[in-house]
Amino acid sequence: MEIKNFYEPFPYIIIDTYYNDAELTLIWEELNFLCYPSKLRRATAKSGGAQTPDGQLLKLNYHSYLDGLYAFRDMSNILMVNRKLFGNGYEIFRQHDSWFFKNLHINKDNTQVGYYEENDEYKTHIDSSTITALTWLYKTPKRFTGGDLILPDYDTEIKVYNNRTFIFPSFIKHGVIPVSMKEQYRNTKSGRFCISQFGQLDMSIPMSPTHD
């Protein structure tokens, strides 16, 4: 796990080689399962796809919110291994010197799996949480182009690499540029996967020692 802290133009963290081989095996078992028909659903207004105030869809991909999919967290490989983001007293966050990460307190998080193929994108938006962590995964060799993350207010682009995690304040505007894939690689699970974790402080939930 290679952690790099950034301070400009806003505080963020990039972690390369985020998951180890054993964790990746567990994650890919679930991703392959989720790619069966009817598991990951096309983003629509009814399925929870983000939209503009006038009803235009921002999200053009396939997705599923895992917390609502499983009755128990330990039924999901992904929901179990992604706890490492909050482990050891928020060690990943606290090692960053920014006030944002030093003072971060959350007691609730949700996980979404997204999948992008030809022409899929996510137009510029903000997330309704405090902190967002995006982990990108794809099968190698890479069979698509595009799909990088843009932060238009800061003229910044974050490149998508396999097993890379990008952690940043949720109120920063961000989007995904369109993905391009040759026809022979479509519908083969060879696109861009993104595991999104959204953390926030829910004042109705008592803070536990693990969230200090």
Task: Locate predicted features.
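Non-heme Fe(II)/2-oxoglutarate
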Residues: 1-99
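Proline-centered turn/helix-capping motifs that create local helix->coil transitions or kinks
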Residues: 36, 100-104, 141-143
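Short helix-to-loop capping/linker segments positioned immediately adjacent to catalytic or ligand/cofactor-binding
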Residues: 98-102, 120-123
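A short glycine-rich, His/Asp/Glu-containing loop-to-beta-strand
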Residues: 100-115
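Catalytic core of Fe(II)/2-oxoglutarate
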Residues: 129, 139-212
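Eukaryotic charged/polar low-complexity linker/IDR segments
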Residues: 133-134
